[in-house]
């Protein structure tokens, strides 16, 4: 995992867009983003321990690629890259490929880009604005973990999401707008 401020230069979203301003794991923790490095070799017991500790009861695999998503590939990528939030945590353990999660830093509203690769386990909290894109390899395979039934419901950023209880709770948790 490598994190840095997004450069906001127009162009292919799959490029690194590295501003040269690194972001520390401590900064990510202050945004309630959790990260673990779990090597692929023998990952299951460690992943299961994190899942049990955090109350994740369900999981599935997602293959974000033309082969994995078929005819819905372009539409899914567009949806993933639209700025949105969820009412549940978004948990991903990368087993193959790579990509970028962009998260909004509050209160600055700057994008932080987080590059993920095999062995990275990332937890994006409920209520944070974020988006996802593949990198130039156009492929990622990840295990998605869920506290309840598997679901992925995005709420695109709007006036309504600003007053969503999960958004308000997130901002309180990180000490913004309390």
From Swiss-Prot:
GO terms for biological process: L-methionine salvage from methylthioadenosine. Its cofactor is Fe(2+); Ni(2+). One of its GO terms (molecular function) is acireductone dioxygenase (Ni2+-requiring) activity. The keyword Iron applies. Pathway: Amino-acid biosynthesis; L-methionine biosynthesis via salvage pathway; L-methionine from S-methyl-5-thio-alpha-D-ribose 1-phosphate: step 5/6. Ni(2+) binds at residues 84, 86, 90, 130. The keyword Cell cycle does not apply. Keywords: Amino-acid biosynthesis, Cytoplasm, Dioxygenase, Iron, Metal-binding, Methionine biosynthesis, Nickel, Nucleus, Oxidoreductase. Binds either 1 Fe or Ni cation per monomer. Iron-binding promotes an acireductone dioxygenase reaction producing 2-keto-4-methylthiobutyrate, while nickel-binding promotes an acireductone dioxygenase reaction producing 3-(methylsulfanyl)propanoate. It comes from the Eukaryota. It holds the Pfam family ARD. Gene3D superfamilies: Jelly Rolls. Signal peptide: none annotated. Fe(2+) binds at residues 84, 86, 90, 130. Its main location: cytoplasm. It catalyses: 1,2-dihydroxy-5-(methylsulfanyl)pent-1-en-3-one + O2 = 4-methylsulfanyl-2-oxobutanoate + formate + 2 H(+); 1,2-dihydroxy-5-(methylsulfanyl)pent-1-en-3-one + O2 = 3-(methylsulfanyl)propanoate + CO + formate + 2 H(+). One of its GO terms (cellular component) is cytoplasm. It is found in: Cytoplasm; Nucleus. Catalyzes 2 different reactions between oxygen and the acireductone 1,2-dihydroxy-3-keto-5-methylthiopentene (DHK-MTPene) depending upon the metal bound in the active site. Fe-containing acireductone dioxygenase (Fe-ARD) produces formate and 2-keto-4-methylthiobutyrate (KMTB), the alpha-ketoacid precursor of methionine in the methionine recycle pathway. Ni-containing acireductone dioxygenase (Ni-ARD) produces methylthiopropionate, carbon monoxide and formate, and does not lie on the methionine recycle pathway. Belongs to the acireductone dioxygenase (ARD) family. PANTHER family: ACIREDUCTONE DIOXYGENASE. HAMAP family: Salvage_MtnD_euk (MF_03154). This is Acireductone dioxygenase 1.
């Amino acid at each position: 995992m490598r994190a840095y401020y997004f450069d906001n230069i127009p162009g292919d979203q799959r490029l690194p867009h590295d501003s040269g301003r690194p972001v520390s794991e401590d900064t990510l923790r202050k945004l309630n983003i959790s990260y673990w490095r779990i090597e692929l070799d023998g990952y299951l017991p460690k992943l299961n321990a994190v899942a049990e500790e955090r109350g994740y009861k369900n999981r599935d695999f997602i293959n974000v690629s033309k082969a994995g998503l078929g005819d819905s590939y372009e539409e899914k990528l567009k949806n993933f890259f639209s700025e949105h939030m969820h009412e549940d945590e978004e948990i991903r353990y990368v087993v193959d490929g790579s990509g970028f999660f962009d998260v909004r830093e509050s209160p600055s509203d700057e994008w932080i880009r987080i590059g993920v690769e095999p062995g990275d386990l990332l937890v994006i909290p409920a209520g944070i604005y974020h988006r996802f894109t593949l990198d130039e390899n156009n492929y990622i395979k990840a295990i998605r973990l869920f506290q309840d039934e598997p679901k992925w419901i995005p709420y695109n950023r709007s006036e309504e999401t600003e007053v969503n209880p999960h958004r308000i709770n997130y901002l309180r948790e990180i000490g913004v707008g309390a």
